């Protein structure tokens, strides 16, 4: 319970080991799970909180994944959806590492190009490569620009 507001306790229990993804853009928690390949049939024990009040963001989502630490490419995917997200690595109930996500300048093999004629969508063994711009994601093979709904293009 908080000393300032006794009506506010912990929304979900702490985890012993794993990852807490905090400050996810409100409404994006389920997309974060999807791009991490976490479904209802996977083995991870999850805690999800959506539209939680946040002084800094107004509203935010939080995801706790027990017994799993994220790989760099997974963190890069999260950065595309939630650029303000914080990744907390938990070991024995303690935060041992806390870092913000960084959107890379170039992403490879993370996003599928929506252009059906792009070489990355053929049988050629070519990984998609996008330059990250303020206005969206620019395919370096076919010059296609993804401006909206990036979550649906993440592999």
Curated annotation (Swiss-Prot):
Binds 1 zinc ion per subunit. Its cofactor is Zn(2+). The keyword Lipoprotein does not apply. GO terms for cellular component: aspartate carbamoyltransferase complex. Keywords: Metal-binding, Pyrimidine biosynthesis, Zinc. Pfam families: PyrI, PyrI_C. Zn(2+) binds at residues 113, 118, 139, 142. InterPro entries: Asp_carbamoyltransf_reg_N, Asp_carbamoylTrfase_reg, Asp_carbamoyltrfase_reg_C, Asp_carbatrfase_reg_C_sf, Asp_carbatrfase_reg_N_sf. GO terms for biological process: 'de novo' pyrimidine nucleobase biosynthetic process; pyrimidine nucleotide biosynthetic process. One of its GO terms (molecular function) is metal ion binding. PANTHER family: ASPARTATE CARBAMOYLTRANSFERASE REGULATORY CHAIN (PTHR35805:SF1). Involved in allosteric regulation of aspartate carbamoyltransferase. This is Aspartate carbamoyltransferase regulatory chain. It comes from Methanoculleus marisnigri (strain ATCC 35101 / DSM 1498 / JR1).
């Amino acid at each position: 319970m908080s000393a300032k507001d006794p009506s506010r306790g912990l929304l979900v229990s702490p985890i012993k080991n794993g990852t807490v993804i905090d400050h996810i853009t409100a409404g994006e928690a389920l997309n974060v799970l999807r791009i991490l390949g976490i479904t209802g049939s996977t083995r991870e024990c999850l805690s999800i909180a959506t539209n939680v009040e946040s002084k800094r963001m107004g509203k935010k989502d939080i995801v706790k994944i027990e017994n799993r630490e994220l790989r760099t490419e997974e963190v890069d995917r999260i950065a595309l959806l939630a650029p303000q997200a914080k990744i907390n690595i938990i070991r024995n109930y303690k935060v041992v590492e806390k870092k913000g996500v960084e959107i890379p300048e170039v992403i490879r093999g993370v996003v599928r190009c929506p252009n059906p004629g792009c070489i990355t969508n053929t049988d050629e063994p070519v990984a998609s490569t996008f330059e990250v711009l303020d206005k969206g994601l620019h395919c370096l093979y076919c010059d296609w620009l993804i401006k909206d709904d990036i979550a649906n293009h993440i592999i």
